[in-house]
């Protein structure tokens, strides 16, 4: 229901000619339900008018019952690419430790990689539905999340931020 409710809020925002940002947060378990697909399909309302709405997919591979179906398989495939993310972090760390030019080279490679990733990799399902895909984002890195949300706020049309999280890594008292 989060995406449906957010879509309603976004339409109301636009009718009232306001410019606030509407954000829906949905878990990977809930995304495999029919109501979520219906809402994703209806986002065409925002696509046509280039109106913004952000969806944050909290992907922790956890739900009350086992996830089944195409969306579950699709998300599992994306998660399995985590080894790629670890490799990427190791390369970035190595580059950042090169005196003088390392940080500049790392930044340039990261920008290039992000551009290529946005074009070809995991979010093609969402892209095919007209929803811009931004991910994979470390859901435990507040600065990475803030950066992703700020980029998403500048986007015209619906955008999904795919945040990978792990149970037990949340708020500590």
Regions found by a protein language model. Name each.
Residues 1-58:
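Thiamine diphosphate
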Residues 60-173:
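Long, well-ordered, tryptophan-enriched scaffold segments
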């Amino acid at each position: 229901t989060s995406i449906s409710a957010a879509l309603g809020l976004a339409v109301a925002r636009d009718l009232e000619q306001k410019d606030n940002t509407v954000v829906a947060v949905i878990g990977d378990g809930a995304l495999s339900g029919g109501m979520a697909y219906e809402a994703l399909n209806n986002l065409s309302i925002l696509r046509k008018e280039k109106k913004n709405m952000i969806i944050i997919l909290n992907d922790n591979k956890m739900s009350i019952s086992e996830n089944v179906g195409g969306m579950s398989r699709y998300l599992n495939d994306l998660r399995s690419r985590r080894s790629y993310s670890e490799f990427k972090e190791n390369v970035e760390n190595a580059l950042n430790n090169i005196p003088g030019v390392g940080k500049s080279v790392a930044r340039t490679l990261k920008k290039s990689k992000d551009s290529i990733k946005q074009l070809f990799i995991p979010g093609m399902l969402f892209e095919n539905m007209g929803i811009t895909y931004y991910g994979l984002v470390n859901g435990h890195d507040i600065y990475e999340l803030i950066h992703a949300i700020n980029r998403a706020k500048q986007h015209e049309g619906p955008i999904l931020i795919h945040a990978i999280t792990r149970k037990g890594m949340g708020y500590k008292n």
